[in-house]
Each structure stands twice: as C-alpha cells, then as structure tokens.
Amino acid sequence: MARRRRAEVRQLQPDLVYGDVLVTAFINKIMRDGKKNLAARIFYDACKIIQEKTGQEPLKVFKQAVENVKPRMEVRSRRVGGANYQVPMEVSPRRQQSLALRWLVQAANQRPERRAAVRIAHELMDAAEGKGGAVKKKEDVERMAEANRAYAHYRW
C-alpha cells in the first residue's frame, strides 16, 4: 500500500499558437532531454505539413487522431489463487488521453520518414483517418480486452 498522499495532477498551460492544453501535452510527449522548444517546433512544422497536404484545420485533424486512438478497454493483470489473469477494465478518460498521445508519438517514431515533423504529420493524418500504427495498437489492446471477457468478474 502507498504510504504517501496521491500526487496531485499538475495543470498544463495552453500552448501559444492554438491555446489548447491537449497540444501542450502532446508537445511534452514529443520532447526529449528537456528540449521543449525543439519539440514545439516539430509539432508546429507537422501542423503546417497537415495544412498543406489535407487543406484541413491541423487542430481538427490532431483532435480527431487523438479521439481515434483512445482505448475504451484494456487488460490489467490480477493475481488470484496463484494464477495471473488478464482482467479487462474500462480506461479512465485521463489515462485514455495519456495512452493515445504516447502511442501516437511511439508510432510516429517507428515510421521510415527521416524528419520528425513529417513522421508526426503522417501519423496524425493516418490516425485521423482510422489507420496507422497508433490505431493498430489501440485495436490490439481492445482485442485483448475482448478476448479476456471471461475474466471480467475478477474486476476490482
């Protein structure tokens, strides 16, 4: 059992271009070694690429991509009588968002394109259309939860 208080959730500042907290969270996920300006530049360059390629509002494409990657269900390990069961559970809204942003960045980093902004732009466009690596990851997680529905009664 935890002996300390639960860490309070820090409120993020909205980003300067779109005034959106979700964009700030995504920039933070892109960031490596504390280089936030570089991460922000990568994201805004990706937005320009999205604008050029699709002609749509980049923020709309980004939000649609995040929505398409959010998992509804996931499995968690639960030990019962010496056996580990993969128990399907609903995902809280905060964790849905966190997982979606993480999976988008991971899927973008596995793409073959050389520039980070291009990788992120293409992954966001694919995810907004319901395809791409991040959407596949979401579907895999939800498929696992569906396959383990028999253990749903072990929920806590």
UniProtKB/Swiss-Prot annotation:
One of its GO terms (biological process) is translation. One of its GO terms (cellular component) is small ribosomal subunit. Keywords: Ribonucleoprotein, Ribosomal protein, RNA-binding, rRNA-binding, tRNA-binding. Signal peptide: none annotated. Part of the 30S ribosomal subunit. Contacts proteins S9 and S11. Binds to the C-terminus of IF3 and to the C-terminus of Era. One of the primary rRNA binding proteins, it binds directly to 3'-end of the 16S rRNA where it nucleates assembly of the head domain of the 30S subunit. Is located at the subunit interface close to the decoding center. Binds mRNA and the E site tRNA blocking its exit path in the ribosome. This blockage implies that this section of the ribosome must be able to move to release the deacetylated tRNA. The keyword Ribonucleoprotein applies. This is Small ribosomal subunit protein uS7. PANTHER family: RIBOSOMAL PROTEIN S7. PROSITE patterns: RIBOSOMAL_S7. Belongs to the universal ribosomal protein uS7 family. GO terms for molecular function: rRNA binding; structural constituent of ribosome; tRNA binding.
